[in-house]
Amino acid sequence: MAQFSPKPEWLKVRAPGGDTYHHLKETFRKLDLHTVCEEARCPNVGECWREGTATVMLLGDVCTRGCRFCAVTTGDPRGAVDVREPEHVARAIARLSLQYVVMTMVNRDDLLDGGAEHVARTVSRLHALRPDLLIETLVGDFQGHMSAVDMVVDAGPDVFAHNVEVVRRITRVIRDVRSSYDQSLAVLRRAKERQRRLAADAAEAGAPAPRRLTKSSIMVGIGETDDEVLEALRDLREAGVDIVTIGQYLRPSSKHAPVQRFVEPETFAAFERAALEMGFLYAASAPLVRSSYKAAEVFVRSLMDRGGAALPASPGAAAVEALLEERLAVARREAARLTAELDPDEPRPPVAPAPASASPARLVPAASLIRR
């Protein structure tokens, strides 16, 4: 693909703006908070900030790794850590009146624990200040140190996220040499095992079992094949991942890996269907979807609000199938409604009515990711 191939229409977004966007931008400046939305030049920054959603980056804005897709600054922080950051960030986020917050981090290979204790302290402090707040942590691989993974999970984030980023074959070409596809899978597998252990311990003690999820993300259009994407989805599901997001890779600059193809929206829809059929609790697959995209956050909130419907103990449980069927029905109805909005003259097949047991208002189908 030519270096300066124009973006297709479905990848064009309006410029950032709006009162909420400017308020958040000013608030982050005043509170001295780094956001990955800006550091990584996310194309959704305008939309997410208008909706009052943002992803805060911990441990500074210099990453020790140099992946070929990432716009975050690479360097050597030389062990520098702001020990006041957990308290500062927790208090700052608590002031923003958010329902859901994503906290990510730069890789810190210069620290013995990769920054795990720092992240865990921030989560714990934020829980203390805002026990009603749902927290997602998007972390690195901690160089494969599972004790670091345990430390973050034990702090109690509602969602533990770690991205495989790309399919297996091109991992060594696209990601930093210190990253590994299998190591990322091992981190996700360990996080799910730890979540299940904590839930079992709580149940044994007669306490409510915490609802915890794992999440990962894949970029496409960077040299993979469709079959390799499906293979990566199977690998993630085998590792116990609950939520997956798939989005188009966009080149941050001429120094980064070139875009190999612009994946059609129909192909993204096929990836999403395949993921749901594999048993993921949620799959968001569309050109502008990113790991921290707000629609996935809304789904987590809806899932956590499902009354007494606890998460299944194993991926093959009947509860997963029932939940999947319910969500698919909602997604079909939402897709039909959206099609009617976009093209009212287009004939459409009849859509089955909602079953009496369904709760459409609490479910967020991935059709809501399509940009209007």
Curated annotation (Swiss-Prot):
Radical SAM core domain span: 49-281
Gene Ontology MF, one: metal ion binding
Class of this enzyme: transferase
Entry keyword Ubl conjugation: no
Residue ranges, annotated region (Disordered): 338-372
Start-end of Low complexity biased regions: 354-372
Listed InterPro entries: Aldolase_TIM, Elp3/MiaA/NifB-like_rSAM, LIAS_N, Lipoyl_synth, rSAM
Pfam families recorded: LIAS_N, Radical_SAM
Cofactor note (record): Binds 2 [4Fe-4S] clusters per subunit. One cluster is coordinated with 3 cysteines and an exchangeable S-adenosyl-L-methionine.
Residues that coordinate or bind [4Fe-4S] cluster 2: C63, C67, C70
Catalysed reactions, semicolon-separated: [[Fe-S] cluster scaffold protein carrying a second [4Fe-4S](2+) cluster] + N(6)-octanoyl-L-lysyl-[protein] + 2 oxidized [2Fe-2S]-[ferredoxin] + 2 S-adenosyl-L-methionine + 4 H(+) = [[Fe-S] cluster scaffold protein] + N(6)-[(R)-dihydrolipoyl]-L-lysyl-[protein] + 4 Fe(3+) + 2 hydrogen sulfide + 2 5'-deoxyadenosine + 2 L-methionine + 2 reduced [2Fe-2S]-[ferredoxin]
Keyword rRNA processing: no
Pathway(s) the chain acts in: Protein modification; protein lipoylation via endogenous pathway; protein N(6)-(lipoyl)lysine from octanoyl-[acyl-carrier-protein]: step 2/2
Protein's name according to its UniProt entry: Lipoyl synthase
